[in-house]
Amino acid sequence: MKRILDTVHGYIYIDDDLMSSFVDTLYFQRLRRIEQTSARAVFPSARHDRFIYSLGVYAIGRRIVDSIKANKDDFGYKEAVHEPFFKSYLIACLMHDCAHTPFSHTFEGYFKGSEEELAILLKNELEDSESFEIDRFDDNKEEFKIAPHEYLSAILCLKKYKKEVVQYGAIPDLVARMIVGIQYKQNHSFENCLISLIHGDVIDADRLDYVCRDRWASGYSTSTIDVARLIASIHIIKKDGEQYRVCYDSSAIHDIEGVLAVKEFQQKFVINHHTICYEQFLLKKAMEHTANCLINEDCSSENEETATLALKSLCNPPVMWDGLHAYGFDIDYLSDDDFVNMMKRFMDNTYVNQWFSRNYAMKPLWKSKADFYSLFSSKKNDPLDEYNSVYRKSDPYNLEREFRGELKVEDFLRLNAEEKVSCISNNMFILTKNGSFQSHESLFGHQESKSSVLFFYLYLSSDAMRYKDRIIKYLNA
């Protein structure tokens, strides 16, 4: 047993065979050089990476397994039956981000459109690809949303670690399902419970680590979460021939709501901070320019489509396990460092220079929702109508027409900032004091489902800033 000291969870204990077979390998160690978040533009101390985060998710997962096994009578524990499921869960917790691309989620959008290709690549690695193909679509034939990095990590885990997964006593196909979050439609309700505890709507090992770790690393203050108490409240229960269900002690409701509160804070004030949104825009544009120069040998072209396609070539899925051996590159285990070194060759580009220097060429017209509604709220109009009106007028081409001869479209930048809002699932089950379990909905009423709240920022060049009052007046008209 290896012992690793972590600032968030204390000592993390990992089996020797997991260390040698998974952690101390090239693909996993690569995660030391994949930054966890984009928050450092505003919170400089947020210097944590996907490596320690993955270990943290494993630590949470191990405690969840211990909590479930402490109540063996709830589900009729049988070692030969349930241990392979628990071992699969622990490997999935450890490896769920093993193929995260450089700069984490920043470049994930460049894999969009390749989901079907990724699904095919994963099915090629599965023993039972037919049931996976059925289960990845809902009853309306709509495909469940699987993020590119989840597909990539599941594929990498099976391509490079399948033998090790089997040797540990786990089930490769189940590990892959846990990583991408696809539950079984028929039977396998116990396995589905474990899938939900790494890939759930509200509470899972993944979320419990990052809401704690991101807050600790960044230094901001928000709701506290008693993780130990919350984990101790988790049960998997089967009664009267029904399917297995994940249940939580009623005393944990406050802590569950605390997780949601921290997540909401992160969405509003960290992920969608105006500086972080602009910095992410710069990084994407800087890498698009870099890729266009290196692949197409064209640094003068301003064609956005060509530059985007060039970067998509660098983000081709197989580079995450086969390496980048094209366009003059010879890079294995692609990480943040590699993208940084590429960009340094083009410091004269405005996007590259701004990203490295933090000397931004554009400033936001408003910095928060409070700013926005103080500028544009009206007692006469519905807030949504007001928002839509400002959004429509703030299109850079509309602004260029309004200020024809004075400002150009390049003087304006509009960036969307989408907030993903979560609530306690209506299907979450609560274990009451009398030993029965009931849905959260039956106890507390129906909750609105997870949704997205749209918001946006308008950034102005230094020239446009001189017209700030006129721009506000036009948007308010």
What role is predicted for each listed range?
Residues 1-91, 99-362:
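Sequence-structural signature of the catalytic-core scaffold of metal-dependent phosphohydrolases
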Residues 270, 275, 284, 294-477:
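Terminal helices and disordered tails flanking the catalytic cores of nucleotide-processing hydrolases
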